[in-house]
Amino acid sequence: MRVVILGSGVVGVASAWYLNQAGHEVTVIDREPGAALETSAANAGQISPGYAAPWAAPGVPLKAIKWMFQRHAPLAVRLDGTQFQLKWMWQMLRNCDTSHYMENKGRMVRLAEYSRDCLKALRAETNIQYEGRQGGTLQLFRTEQQYENATRDIAVLEDAGVPYQLLESSRLAEVDPALAEVAHKLTGGLQLPNDETGDCQLFTQNLARMAEQAGVKFRFNTPVDQLLCDGEQIYGVKFGDEVIKADAYVMAFGSYSTAMLKGIVDIPVYPLKGYSLTIPIAQEDGAPVSTILDETYKIAITRFDNRIRVGGMAEIVGFNTELLQPRRETLEMVVRDLYPRGGHVEQATFWTGLRPMTPDGTPVVGSTRFKNLWLNTGHGTLGWTMACGSGQLLSDLLSGRTPAIPYEDLSVARYSRGFTPSRPGHLHGAHS
């Protein structure tokens, strides 16, 4: 069938690839001149299924109050006066108890683990290049309390069958030799050896080229005005005087999905602003070997071939994309503290992006009350980690195939009572 995908970030392009491979005629529409030029452009670069976890966690409300008075706080809030922001924050607060946290983390890890398997299969099939590494992820703790709290997450990892190592500070250099110089500042770490890293933008643009060669059409420089609907069906995508029609439509506009779906489907996806630095490597033996997660500052430090990507922080400030110097200083402080010889920080490229975040941290993937409208959005800080799995899952659902993982709790249905997701394969002409 003919499928239109709205959005050419990593999630949209992955969706296009898997739908094309399933035999569908796919068109991708985006306002930008190319793929992966917004949120997917310079994210932290880690593919970390085991660390997939919601920001809505026990203790976060109290921490948020403390962070208001800290210079290098990982989370900041600025009220924008909108009812949507207040509602979203209230929903997030309601997910900050242990029960919700464990449930949300469990389904996030499930999708993220599946996504890594899909990426591995894609890499074996296509030999796609993206400066990828399979060196695992190491979460660093600066306090004894953080080290002790890791046992909560370990329970979820064990349930999901994710291998891990809980390391004392004296053993951190076994995983990342450059940390030997700063181990005295740390209390320990949690290593997940199966995690990966890679340049998300490079991956997305290379996958887009492969998809185009396979028959996917890309309509760039095409700002969408609205989705046209009639009854329980979408009948077109309007931009200017032109209307593109298809049999099915996939919303993958990231943070902009909510506004585009207004009056059609209500989804709680809010822009969570983040920042990154991309730094040329100075000394090879002083740079990280894979991905490091600083638990205190919620910042990731990732190794590419000849660059270090430092990314993180979260600002609930609406669609503000201003580059704030204090945020740059925080990123510089963390990377200099952990890898003082690693990179030419003064030559860094500073970037910001808006991650599409749901209040429970889990993305929205699946059907809607509209028979031919599908969602693949709301991946928050884990779009790169979850992209391939979300794309394959969406392709299976839209094509009428039984997905490889449970998916009901990933749909928009979880936000409303009495709503049952459409049966997979309900569209006439769906491929089997």
UniProtKB/Swiss-Prot annotation:
Protein name: D-amino acid dehydrogenase
Catalytic activity as recorded in UniProt: a D-alpha-amino acid + A + H2O = a 2-oxocarboxylate + AH2 + NH4(+)
Species of the source: Shigella flexneri
Key words of the record: FAD, Flavoprotein, Oxidoreductase
Pathway: Amino-acid degradation; D-alanine degradation; NH(3) and pyruvate from D-alanine: step 1/1
GO CC annotation, single: cytoplasm
GO biological process entries: D-alanine catabolic process
Cofactor(s) the record lists: FAD
Any GO MF annotation of the entry: D-amino-acid dehydrogenase activity
Entries under NCBIfam families matching the protein: PRK00711.1
EC number: 1.4.99.-
Bilayer-spanning residue ranges: none
Cleavable signal peptide: none
